[in-house]
Amino acid sequence: MKVDVHTHILPERLPDFRKMPGGERFVRIEHHAPGRARLIVDGSSFREIESNSWSVEARLAECDAAGVDVQVLSTVPVLFSYWAQPDPALDLARRLNDHIAGVVAAHPSRFAGLGTIPMQSPELAIRELERCVRELGLSGVEIGSNVNGANLDSPELFPIFEAAASLGAAVFVHPWEMAGRDRMTRYWLPWLVGMPAELSLAICSLIFGGVLERLPALRIAFAHGGGAFPATIGRIVRGFEARPDLCAVSNGVSPREYLGRIYVDSLVHEPLMLRYLLDLMGPDRIALGSDYPFPLGEARPGELIDSCGFPEKTRARLLHGTALEWLDLPAARFGGAASRGRGPDQG
């Protein structure tokens, strides 16, 4: 069975918020050809998308063709809208969450869902987080790697993580609004350089700021294999040991200890890096993720894992076992995989 924890979806239509304060910054969908649309931000085209971004039928057909049994659905990060006034941001989040919940409810053996919350208003974010879990039946939430430039250890954000831990909600951190993006205007550098750096910044902030130490029950995962954090763990630990006066002011536990407490997806694009991640973190911390349906993702989810020749027990853990543990979902919910030729213990 393959459970893909990193996939994005959005409704075919979005509300027009242009009359709201800052309304031009809200994303609009401009359908310009059959099965094709543009995401419009600030009056300019941000990204070209195809019907698999919104059509459940197209998505299921592509999942079947690629051998993916379950997708974990989350919104497209450009829709986070943390910059917006809290009320319209909450309105948008509720619409996006209702849409994801509807897709999951219609196909419970093929999808699980993560909501989005207005992180710029912790009170509203917690309220919507509770609704996502208690009313909509979603497994948790996807959040950005910073909130309008505030790192994730900012004190005002702690109650959100505390609520997630209390609710048993999974948290998926996706890079967005990358640091240094003003210097990365060419060559797709925000995606190639900014995102890995942004994720390391998020992880280090949560560790050094003591958030993960204070909330040991928090099930938190990071996209793109945790970005640059795993590759630079030696440097980070050395800095922690050499300058505790700078690094250990809020948490005296070594960053290395958290390699066994956070989750990452498998989207690292390179067999050597995936093997390194496995050696560093173990299979219980790595879950299949593809970034479907976007071009920097893995076109055939699980192909990188399969290419490494891992033992079957390890392979099964990477393809679905870790995902189900992070989401706190039983394999039996997705038992339909067996009727599609792949049981819970098969790839």
Task: Outline where the language-model segments fall.
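Mid-to-C-terminal alpha-helical segments outside catalytic/metal-binding sites
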Residues: 1, 5, 12-70, 98-106, ...
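Active-site gating loops and adjacent loop-to-helix segments of metal-dependent hydrolytic enzymes
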Residues: 11-51, 83, 178-197, 236-259
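Catalytic metal-binding/acid-base residues of hydrolase active sites
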Residues: 8, 176-177, 226, 293
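Acidic-and-aromatic substrate-binding clefts and catalytic sites of carbohydrate-active enzymes
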Residues: 49-54, 81, 119-125, 148-155, ...
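Active-site gating/metal-coordination segments in enzymes
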Residues: 69-206
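Hydrophobic faces of well-ordered beta-strands that scaffold small-molecule active sites
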Residues: 3-5, 71-73, 112-115, 141-143, ...
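Short acidic/glycine-rich loop or secondary-structure boundary segments that cap or lie
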Residues: 228-233, 237-238, 272-273
